[in-house]
């Protein structure tokens, strides 16, 4: 089982929540924490997770999850409601940077994702979730690549595929309709020709009868 699957099962499933995405991160600038506050737990892995509740009305949240060295379990740390997210900074709109910042109402963190592609995927999911579940105040996405906001997004590609399929089906139906229309015109012409032939034959028959 992957780390993200384990996080979803251990952290979110018991609370009837569904994890939409996660990104493994490290701080770009380490916070100065007193030794006693760390509890001597040593090194750890950090994940930023995005989840939603299964119950309506749906609530979305961002959670910081940690896995300490030597442990197979995960620990829920800080959590923010999606409404508290104010700004998402992609750092570099022109390149594949793994760095990003998250600004909340009461917190600001500077992160580096494990890979630029993992960050990109998480950003796409985060942007889509904000558009779907936030109606009033949406966070600002700055210094982000265009593929995160639209065009090449993995979330939009599926919609584009569906749209393309619908357009092709519509075109096929239109072409079929045109063919049927032409067939109906030919049928009508044949019908008129048959009527004219019948009338001519009737006139000839009457003429010879006379």
UniProtKB/Swiss-Prot annotation:
* Tissue specificity comment: Detected at low levels in brain, and at very low levels in heart, adrenal gland, testis, liver and kidney.
Q: What is its main location?
A: cytoplasm
According to the entry, every stretch annotated as the v-SNARE coiled-coil homology domain falls at: 151-210
> Pfam families recorded for this chain?
Sec3-PIP2_bind (PF15277), Synaptobrevin (PF00957)
Keyword Cytoplasm among UniProt keywords: yes
Q: Membrane topology per the record?
A: Peripheral membrane protein
The cellular component terms of Gene Ontology attached to this UniProt record, alphabetical and capped at eight, are: adherens junction; cytoplasm; membrane
The record ties this protein, via SMART domains, to: Sec3-PIP2_bind (SM01313)
One of the GO BP terms on file: regulation of SNARE complex assembly
Where is this protein found?
Cytoplasm; Membrane
InterPro entries noted in UniProt: Sec3-PIP2_bind, STXBP6_PH, STXBP6_SNARE, V_SNARE_CC
What would you give as a GO molecular function for this chain, any one?
A: cadherin binding involved in cell-cell adhesion
Q: Which UniProt keywords apply?
A: Acetylation, Coiled coil, Cytoplasm, Membrane
Q: Which residues carry this modification: N-acetylserine?
A: 2
Q: Which CDD domains match?
A: PH-STXBP6 (cd14681), R-SNARE_STXBP6 (cd15892)
Which PANTHER family does the annotation name?
EXOCYST COMPLEX COMPONENT 1 ISOFORM X1, SEC3/SYNTAXIN-RELATED
Q: How does the record describe its quaternary structure?
A: Part of a ternary complex containing SNAP25 and STX1A that can be dissociated by NAPA and NSF. Interacts with STX4A.
What exactly does this protein do? Forms non-fusogenic complexes with SNAP25 and STX1A and may thereby modulate the formation of functional SNARE complexes and exocytosis.
**Protein name from the UniProt record:** Syntaxin-binding protein 6
Source organism per UniProt: Homo sapiens
């Amino acid at each position: 089982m992957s780390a993200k699957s384990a996080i979803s099962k251990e952290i979110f499933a018991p609370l009837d929540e569904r994890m939409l995405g996660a990104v493994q991160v490290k701080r770009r600038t380490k916070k100065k924490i007193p030794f006693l506050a760390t509890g001597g737990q040593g090194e750890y892995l950090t994940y930023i997770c995005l989840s939603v509740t299964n119950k309506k009305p749906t609530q979305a949240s961002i959670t910081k999850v940690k896995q300490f060295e030597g442990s197979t379990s995960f620990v829920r740390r800080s959590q923010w409601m999606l409404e508290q997210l104010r700004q998402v900074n992609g750092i570099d709109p022109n390149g594949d940077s793994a760095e990003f910042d998250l600004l909340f109402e009461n917190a600001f963190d500077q992160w580096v994702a494990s890979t630029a592609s993992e960050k990109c995927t998480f950003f796409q999911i985060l942007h889509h979730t904000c558009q779907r579940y936030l109606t009033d105040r949406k966070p600002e996405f700055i210094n982000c690549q265009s593929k995160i906001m639209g065009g090449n997004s993995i979330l939009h590609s599926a919609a584009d595929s569906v749209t393309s399929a619908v357009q092709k089906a519509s075109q096929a139906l239109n072409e079929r309709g045109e063919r049927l229309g032409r067939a109906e015109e030919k049928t009508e012409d044949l019908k008129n020709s048959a009527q004219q032939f019948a009338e001519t034959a009737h006139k000839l028959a009457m003429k010879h009868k006379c």
